[in-house]
Regions:
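Long, charged, low-complexity intrinsically disordered regions
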Residues: 1-93
Length: 93
């Protein structure tokens, strides 16, 4: 069976242009809706790589959210930072 990260995403959500709080809130809503609609599906969260020397706060907080939702066991089965480092692939439960 091929690795789940080689599957095309069933849905994509772009967090560009949002504040960190908006991005995390909307990402969680998106993931919960998608987990109900597409159990076992794969979705992409586009965070961007961060600007200049300011780090990547949306990416960092999104990673924390994904870990929390994975540990909770009802929404996220697994996730991976894509090679571009500007998006996550997420396997839903």
């Amino acid at each position: 069976m091929p690795n789940w990260t080689s599957r095309p995403a069933d849905a994509t959500f772009d967090l560009h242009g949002l504040t960190v709080l908006e991005a995390v809130t909307r990402a969680e809503q998106f993931l919960r809706v998608q987990a109900r609609a597409r159990p076992g599906g794969v979705v992409r969260l586009i965070t961007g790589r961060g600007r200049g020397g300011g780090g990547a706060p949306i990416r960092t907080r999104t990673r924390t959210l994904l870990k929390t939702l994975r540990e909770g066991g009802r929404v996220v089965a697994d996730f991976a930072l894509e090679d571009s480092e500007g998006s996550f692939l997420v396997r839903l439960r």
